[in-house]
Amino acid sequence: MDRLKLEGVGMTSKRTRDRLVERLLEQGVTSQFVLELIANTPRHLFLDEALSHRAYEDASLPIGFGQTLSQPYIVARMTEILLGAAGDPKRVLEIGTGSGYQTCILAQAVEHVWSVERIKPLQDKAKQRLRHLGLNNVTYKHADGGFGWPEQGPFDAILSAAAPRDIPKSLLQQLAHNGVLVIPVGADEQVLTLVIRDGEEDKFITQKLEPVKFVPLLSGVTR
């Protein structure tokens, strides 16, 4: 895991960030480690300037190309689920770099993140942001996220920031034994889902957790 370098980075007031953390606590996020990551990560840097004043609202916000920056609750919840189920994951695959905000949270929590994004301009911006924050433990790929990144697998954990209609088998096969997948699943009605690969019997245990709303996991790439 890498630590953020915040020298020269404008931070909003501690009070504003504390209010966000209080809202996350009220919504059921309990991991102190995850709450500290959210509190100390400058979310406004992951938005265009016109929307940066809304960065610490618990809301999803547009980042262009029909994509969104997930609301802080969802980022915190998915990170909490991933870390809780995987224990101490070293190698994590992220499907959908997007703005880089979830990537940034993961990179502070695990040894290395591999992040796949189908929209190149979004990933290029995310790379710049994370480099500016001193995070060097992320490897990026411009590709169709539905295929994962088999050359780099297996992974201790996989997190998807976009929703397929059904869980891609390719992602399941890239889980290490006892690895976990945290993914929203569905079209009109989506459910946040946790899949654990049972290392002894090599079977997949699926838990449906809560209703969510994500952008769909689309195929192909955009330059």
From Swiss-Prot:
It is an enzyme of class 2 (transferase). GO terms for biological process: methylation; protein modification process; protein repair. Pfam families: PCMT. The active site is at S70. Keywords: Cytoplasm, Methyltransferase, S-adenosyl-L-methionine, Transferase. One of its GO terms (cellular component) is cytoplasm. Catalyzes the methyl esterification of L-isoaspartyl residues in peptides and proteins that result from spontaneous decomposition of normal L-aspartyl and L-asparaginyl residues. It plays a role in the repair and/or degradation of damaged proteins. Belongs to the methyltransferase superfamily. L-isoaspartyl/D-aspartyl protein methyltransferase family. This is Protein-L-isoaspartate O-methyltransferase.
